[in-house]
């Protein structure tokens, strides 16, 4: 079965993103296909490369990055939500005249069209 996940919670402070990550791992372990994860609203904080958890905590941002690298899962973040929350890639940083970017590699700024496409092409869309 082909799945897409929507994450609306930040990397830390709620269980949404952590639960989504564990669900993603379980899907892959059970042989399902996870085509994409779409980060929306507060979920865009999962793509902030400046996140620095305590040494005894799981690094969820890098966990998502590994999921992308090892399994080819697309990590799309809503561009409008990201810009409102200060998450920018190099292109947007240049366009806005910012000194630097902070989008973690492996993540892609995307529009809601990426979520619509996932909804149409996947068997299930699960939101956390």
Curated annotation (Swiss-Prot):
SUPFAM superfamilies: DsrEFH-like. Keywords: Cytoplasm, Transferase, tRNA processing. The active site is at residue 78. GO terms for biological process: tRNA wobble position uridine thiolation. Gene3D superfamilies: DsrEFH-like. It is found in: Cytoplasm. Its main location: cytoplasm. GO terms for molecular function: sulfur carrier activity; sulfurtransferase activity. It holds the Pfam family DsrE. Its EC number is 2.8.1.-. Disulfide bonds: none annotated. GO terms for cellular component: sulfurtransferase complex. Belongs to the DsrE/TusD family. PANTHER family: PROTEIN YCHN, SULFURTRANSFERASE TUSD. Part of a sulfur-relay system required for 2-thiolation of 5-methylaminomethyl-2-thiouridine (mnm(5)s(2)U) at tRNA wobble positions. Accepts sulfur from TusA and transfers it in turn to TusE. Heterohexamer, formed by a dimer of trimers. The hexameric TusBCD complex contains 2 copies each of TusB, TusC and TusD. The TusBCD complex interacts with TusE. This is Sulfurtransferase TusD. It comes from Escherichia coli O17:K52:H18 (strain UMN026 / ExPEC). The gene is tusD.
């Amino acid at each position: 079965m082909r799945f897409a996940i929507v994450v609306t919670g930040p990397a830390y402070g709620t269980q949404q993103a952590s639960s989504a990550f564990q669900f993603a791992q379980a899907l892959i372990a059970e042989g399902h296909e996870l085509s994409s994860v779409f980060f929306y609203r507060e979920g865009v904080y999962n793509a902030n490369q400046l996140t620095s958890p305590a040494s005894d905590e799981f690094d969820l941002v890098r966990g998502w990055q590994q999921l992308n690298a090892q399994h080819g899962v697309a990590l799309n973040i809503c561009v409008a939500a990201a810009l409102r929350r200060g998450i920018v890639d190099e292109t947007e940083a240049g366009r806005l005249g910012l000194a630097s970017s902070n989008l973690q590699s492996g993540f892609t700024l995307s529009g809601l069209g990426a979520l619509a496409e996932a909804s149409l092409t996947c068997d299930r869309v699960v939101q956390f």
